Every structure is written in structure tokens, then in C-alpha cells.
């Protein structure tokens, strides 16, 4: 039974307190690809030591014929340290995670104006992730602004909805508050 899904502050847990079943890290907590050995070992160790699932934002890497493509992803690590599932963000942020009309900008020789923009590939499936006997619907940041899309997770069987985001990189600006209003 999922009872506590927040991260305790230092000194908050007392001996005998129940440990969390799920540890949630934000979108892009570290600039590592999912296949980076350090990230893989760190997340697996946290899951094993805490006996909890870990959900963390990662840079997902495509495999097979799609190799070389990168996704903004949420990775689920099981309590035994195995990486069991990954959700790839579908609704990317224009001019933040991809350049709309990229070929148009190239024709106008304006590509250098947008070269700092991420070049993510959108995911294709709003899959639910298995956490114990629950099904978790995880959407990433900006996707929370589209309620019909979020509802698709519930339609796919999600019993718990989690939005991982890292609005902290906007600093002391109106952006995090704007995101909150859009998500309501």
C-alpha cells in the first residue's frame, strides 16, 4: 500500500517509521544519459538500499534502428535495482525541447539562433508503469498543461498520477507559477 510518497527531510524519519514505497526525482536531475554507468549505478543503489521503487527523469536513448535519438524520459527502477520501465515524453516544449519548422529556419540561415534548443524526439505511447500492485501514470513537466492527454493515463489503467518537473531551472521568474496555473 502506498502510504507516503514524499521525500523525508533530514532527521524527519525516526527508527521504526515506515520507509517510502516510491522515491521520485525530478525531470532531468542530472545531465546524464540513461546508459551512463554512474547514473545507472546510483539509481540502482538508491532503490536497493531503500527497498523502494525510484522514478527519475533521465535522457532516454533510442535503440535499434532509432539509435542516436534522445528522449526526455522518466525511468522506473525496481527495489532490486533493475531498470524495469521507461516513459518517453510525448508533448515536447517548442523552442525548449525541439525546434518547430527546423528546416524552415535552416533555409533562412537562422539555425544558429536556435542551436541551444534541445533536439529531443517525442515518445509515442502513454504507458503506465508498474509499482507494486499499482499502475503509475507519469507525465513530464509541460505535459501537465494538457488535461485530455493526462486523462489518457487513467484510461490506460493508471491509479496514481505523477508529474515530474524541474521548474527550478527557471530561477526566480514567473515561469514556475505560470506552469502551475496551466496545469490546474
Each model region followed by its residue ranges:
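Enzyme catalytic cores with a strong preference for nitrogen-chemistry domains
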Residues: 1-184
Amino acid at each position: 500500500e502506498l502510504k507516503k510518497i514524499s521525500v523525508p527531510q533530514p532527521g524527519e524519519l525516526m527508527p521504526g517509521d515506515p520507509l517510502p514505497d516510491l522515491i521520485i526525482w525530478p525531470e532531468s536531475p542530472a545531465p546524464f544519459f540513461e546508459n551512463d554507468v554512474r547514473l545507472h549505478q546510483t539509481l540502482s543503489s538508491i532503490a536497493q538500499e531503500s527497498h523502494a521503487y525510484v522514478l527519475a527523469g533521465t535522457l532516454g536513448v533510442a535503440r535499434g534502428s532509432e539509435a542516436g535519438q534522445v528522449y526526455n524520459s522518466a525511468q522506473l527502477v525496481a527495489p532490486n535495482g533493475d531498470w524495469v520501465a521507461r516513459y518517453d515524453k510525448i508533448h515536447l516544449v517548442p523552442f525548449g525541447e525541439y525546434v518547430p519548422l527546423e528546416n524552415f529556419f535552416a533555409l533562412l540561415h537562422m539555425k544558429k539562433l536556435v542551436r541551444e534548443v534541445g533536439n529531443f524526439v517525442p515518445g509515442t505511447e502513454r504507458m503506465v508503469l508498474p509499482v507494486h500492485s499499482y499502475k503509475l501514470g507519469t507525465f513530464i513537466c509541460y505535459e501537465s498543461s494538457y488535461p485530455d492527454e493526462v486523462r489518457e493515463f487513467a484510461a490506460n489503467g493508471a491509479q496514481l498520477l505523477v508529474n515530474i518537473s524541474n521548474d527550478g531551472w527557471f530561477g526566480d521568474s514567473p515561469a514556475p507559477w505560470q506552469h502551475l496555473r496551466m496545469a490546474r
